[in-house]
Amino acid sequence: MSAQVSLELHHRISQFLFHEASLLDDWKFRDWLAQLDEEICYTMRTTVNAQTRDRRKGVQPPTTWIFNDTKDQLERRIARLETGMAWAEEPPSRTRHLISNCQISETDIPNVFAVRVNYLLYRAQKERDETFYVGTRFDKVRRLEDDNWRLLERDIVLDQAVITSHNLSVLF
């Protein structure tokens, strides 16, 4: 990572991420979309368990995309949720996004910052369905001229190699 940012800038970016998480928890998806850059790259790959000897050699097992979404694809996912016909979300999930260990650094691009956070996403649905998603997110955020922020990239890395939930319809 490049140079760390000032405490004030760290606070501003952290507050942006906390606000973004609350929008998802409150099902304010249109407001959440407004926080995304037009060029957003929103990705999650499968997690593959690699042998220690392979990791030492730098051998990475092949992975598959779980999501590799653009803003248009995220808008379509949200439009589907809004129809009431997304059966995976009937009744709607109750989520809680927790983020911690926020590390923020400058990038080579002016006003773009690299963010690494650990996250825990708790999802409850119906009476007894509960799921925990735990991992690391690698985000890039862009500061706009009016001192607002936009999410430019999000790469979600799950710690779980096997996803035990019935579906993966929540947003990270």
From Swiss-Prot:
Enzyme nomenclature, EC number: 1.14.12.19
GO molecular function (one): 3-phenylpropionate dioxygenase activity
Ranges annotated as spanning the membrane: none
Pathway membership: Aromatic compound metabolism; 3-phenylpropanoate degradation
Keyword Kinase attached: no
Chain segments annotated as coiled-coil in the UniProt record: none
Gene Ontology biological-process annotations: 3-phenylpropionate catabolic process
Domain of life: Bacteria
Alphabetically ordered keywords of this record: Aromatic hydrocarbons catabolism, Dioxygenase, NAD, Oxidoreductase
Reactions it catalyzes: 3-phenylpropanoate + NADH + O2 + H(+) = 3-(cis-5,6-dihydroxycyclohexa-1,3-dien-1-yl)propanoate + NAD(+); (E)-cinnamate + NADH + O2 + H(+) = (2E)-3-(cis-5,6-dihydroxycyclohexa-1,3-dien-1-yl)prop-2-enoate + NAD(+)
Family: Belongs to the bacterial ring-hydroxylating dioxygenase beta subunit family.
Subunit (UniProt): This dioxygenase system consists of four proteins: the two subunits of the hydroxylase component (HcaE and HcaF), a ferredoxin (HcaC) and a ferredoxin reductase (HcaD).
Name the UniProt record assigns to this protein: 3-phenylpropionate/cinnamic acid dioxygenase subunit beta
Organism: Escherichia coli O157:H7
